[in-house]
Amino acid sequence: NKKRTGRVVSEYGMQAMPNYSTIKKVTNPEDRHLFSDVLKVHQKAGNGFMKLNSYLNRYFIDSTKVEKMNVKDYTYLTQCMQYYSLKNIIGIHRSKAPYNMGTLVWQLNDCWPVASWSVTDYYNRQPKAAWYAMREAYRDDIVPAIDLTRPIDLPLENPNISWKIKGNEITLKATKAAKYVYIEIEGYTGKLTDNYMDLEAGKEMKISFEGKLNKPVITVMSLYDVLNRYK
Protein backbone atom coordinates (compact mmCIF):
# COMPACT_ATOMS: atom_id res chain seq x y z
CA ASN A 1 0.00 0.00 0.00
CA LYS A 2 1.55 3.31 -1.08
CA LYS A 3 -0.09 5.25 1.77
CA ARG A 4 0.39 2.82 4.63
CA THR A 5 3.59 1.04 5.57
CA GLY A 6 5.29 -0.12 8.74
CA ARG A 7 8.36 1.27 10.47
CA VAL A 8 10.23 -1.96 9.68
CA VAL A 9 8.68 -4.48 7.27
CA SER A 10 10.00 -8.04 7.38
CA GLU A 11 9.31 -11.46 5.88
CA TYR A 12 7.38 -10.48 2.78
CA GLY A 13 7.84 -11.64 -0.78
CA MET A 14 6.30 -12.98 -3.97
CA GLN A 15 6.43 -16.48 -5.35
CA ALA A 16 7.83 -17.42 -8.75
CA MET A 17 8.65 -20.61 -10.57
CA PRO A 18 12.26 -21.83 -10.44
CA ASN A 19 14.39 -21.21 -13.52
CA TYR A 20 13.28 -23.27 -16.51
CA SER A 21 16.62 -25.09 -16.58
CA THR A 22 15.76 -26.37 -13.10
CA ILE A 23 12.28 -27.46 -14.18
CA LYS A 24 13.86 -29.53 -16.95
CA LYS A 25 16.10 -31.25 -14.39
CA VAL A 26 13.25 -32.31 -12.09
CA THR A 27 10.64 -33.26 -14.70
CA ASN A 28 10.26 -35.59 -17.64
CA PRO A 29 9.04 -34.05 -20.91
CA GLU A 30 5.54 -35.45 -20.37
CA ASP A 31 5.33 -33.60 -17.03
CA ARG A 32 6.03 -30.17 -18.48
CA HIS A 33 2.50 -28.85 -18.72
CA LEU A 34 0.39 -26.69 -16.44
CA PHE A 35 -0.36 -27.92 -13.77
CA SER A 36 1.02 -31.44 -13.86
CA ASP A 37 1.19 -33.62 -10.76
CA VAL A 38 4.98 -33.30 -10.73
CA LEU A 39 4.84 -29.50 -10.86
CA LYS A 40 2.28 -29.53 -8.06
CA VAL A 41 4.69 -31.56 -5.91
CA HIS A 42 7.20 -28.74 -6.42
CA GLN A 43 4.72 -26.12 -5.19
CA LYS A 44 4.26 -26.32 -1.42
CA ALA A 45 2.40 -23.06 -0.77
CA GLY A 46 -1.27 -23.45 0.05
CA ASN A 47 -3.23 -22.79 -3.16
CA GLY A 48 0.10 -21.63 -4.58
CA PHE A 49 -0.71 -21.81 -8.28
CA MET A 50 -4.15 -20.28 -7.73
CA LYS A 51 -2.55 -17.31 -5.99
CA LEU A 52 0.12 -16.93 -8.68
CA ASN A 53 -2.54 -17.01 -11.38
CA SER A 54 -4.59 -14.34 -9.63
CA TYR A 55 -1.56 -12.05 -9.48
CA LEU A 56 -0.77 -12.70 -13.14
CA ASN A 57 -4.37 -11.86 -14.00
CA ARG A 58 -4.13 -8.58 -12.10
CA TYR A 59 -0.79 -7.43 -13.43
CA PHE A 60 0.21 -9.29 -16.61
CA ILE A 61 -2.29 -11.42 -18.54
CA ASP A 62 -5.97 -12.38 -18.53
CA SER A 63 -6.59 -15.55 -16.53
CA THR A 64 -8.35 -17.24 -19.46
CA LYS A 65 -5.05 -17.15 -21.35
CA VAL A 66 -2.93 -18.58 -18.53
CA GLU A 67 -4.37 -22.07 -19.05
CA LYS A 68 -3.10 -22.03 -22.65
CA MET A 69 0.48 -21.22 -21.71
CA ASN A 70 3.41 -23.58 -21.93
CA VAL A 71 5.53 -24.08 -18.82
CA LYS A 72 8.47 -22.06 -20.12
CA ASP A 73 6.36 -18.97 -20.79
CA TYR A 74 4.52 -19.41 -17.48
CA THR A 75 7.88 -19.59 -15.70
CA TYR A 76 9.02 -16.41 -17.42
CA LEU A 77 5.86 -14.50 -16.48
CA THR A 78 5.91 -15.57 -12.83
CA GLN A 79 9.50 -14.41 -12.59
CA CYS A 80 8.55 -11.07 -14.18
CA MET A 81 5.77 -10.88 -11.59
CA GLN A 82 8.24 -11.46 -8.77
CA TYR A 83 10.56 -8.82 -10.26
CA TYR A 84 7.73 -6.29 -10.59
CA SER A 85 6.48 -6.92 -7.06
CA LEU A 86 9.77 -6.66 -5.20
CA LYS A 87 11.00 -3.71 -7.25
CA ASN A 88 7.91 -1.69 -6.38
CA ILE A 89 7.44 -2.86 -2.79
CA ILE A 90 11.05 -2.01 -1.91
CA GLY A 91 10.76 1.28 -3.79
CA ILE A 92 7.63 2.26 -1.86
CA HIS A 93 9.17 1.29 1.48
CA ARG A 94 12.31 3.30 0.79
CA SER A 95 10.26 6.30 -0.35
CA LYS A 96 8.71 6.44 3.14
CA ALA A 97 12.01 7.09 4.92
CA PRO A 98 12.53 8.18 7.65
CA TYR A 99 9.19 6.72 8.80
CA ASN A 100 10.12 3.38 7.27
CA MET A 101 13.75 2.50 7.95
CA GLY A 102 13.83 -1.22 7.32
CA THR A 103 12.65 -3.71 4.71
CA LEU A 104 13.61 -7.38 4.75
CA VAL A 105 12.60 -9.66 1.87
CA TRP A 106 11.78 -13.36 2.26
CA GLN A 107 13.65 -15.19 0.80
CA LEU A 108 17.16 -15.45 -0.62
CA ASN A 109 17.64 -19.10 -1.55
CA ASP A 110 16.02 -22.55 -1.66
CA CYS A 111 16.78 -25.89 -0.03
CA TRP A 112 15.25 -27.80 -2.95
CA PRO A 113 14.09 -27.09 -6.55
CA VAL A 114 10.63 -25.59 -6.11
CA ALA A 115 8.27 -22.72 -6.89
CA SER A 116 8.94 -20.37 -3.99
CA TRP A 117 9.65 -16.87 -2.72
CA SER A 118 13.39 -17.36 -3.28
CA VAL A 119 15.20 -14.87 -5.52
CA THR A 120 17.96 -17.34 -6.38
CA ASP A 121 17.59 -20.80 -7.85
CA TYR A 122 18.35 -24.05 -6.03
CA TYR A 123 20.95 -25.09 -8.62
CA ASN A 124 24.18 -23.04 -8.60
CA ARG A 125 22.41 -20.18 -6.81
CA GLN A 126 21.63 -18.71 -10.21
CA PRO A 127 19.65 -15.47 -9.97
CA LYS A 128 15.95 -15.45 -10.71
CA ALA A 129 14.52 -12.25 -12.18
CA ALA A 130 13.78 -10.68 -8.78
CA TRP A 131 17.43 -10.92 -7.73
CA TYR A 132 18.24 -8.26 -10.33
CA ALA A 133 15.29 -6.14 -9.17
CA MET A 134 16.44 -6.29 -5.54
CA ARG A 135 20.03 -5.46 -6.44
CA GLU A 136 18.83 -2.29 -8.14
CA ALA A 137 16.15 -1.33 -5.59
CA TYR A 138 18.55 -1.55 -2.65
CA ARG A 139 21.28 0.59 -4.21
CA ASP A 140 22.47 3.39 -1.92
CA ASP A 141 23.28 5.81 -4.72
CA ILE A 142 19.79 6.09 -6.25
CA VAL A 143 16.18 6.66 -5.30
CA PRO A 144 14.51 3.51 -6.68
CA ALA A 145 11.92 4.09 -9.37
CA ILE A 146 8.32 2.99 -8.84
CA ASP A 147 6.24 1.77 -11.79
CA LEU A 148 3.12 3.86 -12.25
CA THR A 149 1.58 1.59 -14.90
CA ARG A 150 0.87 -2.10 -14.50
CA PRO A 151 2.55 -4.26 -17.16
CA ILE A 152 -0.86 -5.49 -18.37
CA ASP A 153 -1.71 -1.87 -19.32
CA LEU A 154 1.51 -1.09 -21.18
CA PRO A 155 1.18 -0.39 -24.94
CA LEU A 156 3.81 -2.93 -25.97
CA GLU A 157 5.09 -3.08 -29.54
CA ASN A 158 7.31 -5.63 -31.25
CA PRO A 159 10.82 -4.58 -30.18
CA ASN A 160 12.62 -6.64 -32.85
CA ILE A 161 15.54 -7.26 -30.53
CA SER A 162 18.86 -8.00 -32.21
CA TRP A 163 21.97 -9.21 -30.46
CA LYS A 164 25.58 -10.07 -31.11
CA ILE A 165 28.24 -11.74 -29.01
CA LYS A 166 31.93 -10.92 -28.75
CA GLY A 167 34.10 -12.59 -26.16
CA ASN A 168 32.10 -12.72 -22.95
CA GLU A 169 29.87 -9.78 -23.85
CA ILE A 170 26.42 -9.74 -25.45
CA THR A 171 25.25 -6.51 -27.11
CA LEU A 172 21.49 -5.99 -27.38
CA LYS A 173 19.52 -3.46 -29.40
CA ALA A 174 15.78 -2.98 -29.96
CA THR A 175 13.88 -0.91 -32.52
CA LYS A 176 11.08 -0.31 -29.98
CA ALA A 177 11.18 -0.09 -26.20
CA ALA A 178 11.30 -3.59 -24.70
CA LYS A 179 10.22 -4.78 -21.25
CA TYR A 180 11.73 -7.59 -19.14
CA VAL A 181 14.29 -8.65 -21.74
CA TYR A 182 15.47 -12.12 -20.78
CA ILE A 183 18.71 -13.72 -21.96
CA GLU A 184 18.93 -17.51 -21.75
CA ILE A 185 22.23 -19.28 -22.45
CA GLU A 186 21.73 -23.02 -22.79
CA GLY A 187 23.73 -24.97 -20.22
CA TYR A 188 25.22 -21.85 -18.63
CA THR A 189 25.43 -21.98 -14.81
CA GLY A 190 27.03 -18.61 -14.06
CA LYS A 191 25.68 -15.10 -13.61
CA LEU A 192 24.96 -12.33 -16.09
CA THR A 193 25.68 -8.71 -15.21
CA ASP A 194 21.98 -8.03 -15.82
CA ASN A 195 18.84 -9.83 -16.97
CA TYR A 196 15.10 -9.17 -17.26
CA MET A 197 16.05 -5.56 -18.01
CA ASP A 198 14.28 -2.89 -20.03
CA LEU A 199 15.72 -1.69 -23.34
CA GLU A 200 15.21 1.78 -24.73
CA ALA A 201 14.44 2.01 -28.44
CA GLY A 202 17.57 2.40 -30.55
CA LYS A 203 20.04 2.21 -27.65
CA GLU A 204 22.57 -0.57 -27.23
CA MET A 205 23.00 -2.43 -23.94
CA LYS A 206 26.00 -4.61 -23.15
CA ILE A 207 25.64 -7.63 -20.85
CA SER A 208 28.62 -9.68 -19.69
CA PHE A 209 28.79 -13.28 -18.54
CA GLU A 210 31.38 -15.18 -16.52
CA GLY A 211 34.03 -17.29 -18.22
CA LYS A 212 34.19 -18.39 -21.84
CA LEU A 213 31.57 -20.29 -23.80
CA ASN A 214 32.15 -22.31 -26.96
CA LYS A 215 29.45 -21.55 -29.52
CA PRO A 216 26.76 -20.73 -26.94
CA VAL A 217 23.09 -21.26 -27.79
CA ILE A 218 21.44 -17.98 -26.80
CA THR A 219 17.74 -17.09 -26.69
CA VAL A 220 16.50 -13.54 -26.11
CA MET A 221 12.86 -12.71 -25.44
CA SER A 222 10.78 -9.88 -24.01
CA LEU A 223 7.38 -9.43 -22.42
CA TYR A 224 5.92 -8.57 -25.82
CA ASP A 225 7.11 -11.86 -27.31
CA VAL A 226 5.46 -13.94 -24.60
CA LEU A 227 2.17 -12.04 -24.36
CA ASN A 228 1.85 -11.89 -28.15
CA ARG A 229 1.77 -15.70 -28.30
CA TYR A 230 -1.49 -15.75 -26.36
CA LYS A 231 -3.50 -12.98 -27.99
Go through each PLM region and give its residues:
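Short acidic, flexible loop segments centered on an aromatic residue
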Residues: 174-191
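Substrate-binding clefts and catalytic carboxylate motifs of secreted carbohydrate-active enzymes
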Residues: 1-145
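Terminal connector regions
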Residues: 136, 140-157, 212-231
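Conserved active-site loop/cleft motifs that coordinate metal ions or position small ligands
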Residues: 101-107, 182, 219-221
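Hydrophobic, well-ordered secondary-structure elements that form the walls
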Residues: 103, 172, 183, 202
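Short beta-strand elements of extracellular/lumenal beta-sandwich folds
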Residues: 166-176
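Beta-rich interaction modules in large eukaryotic scaffold/regulatory proteins
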Residues: 161-163, 190
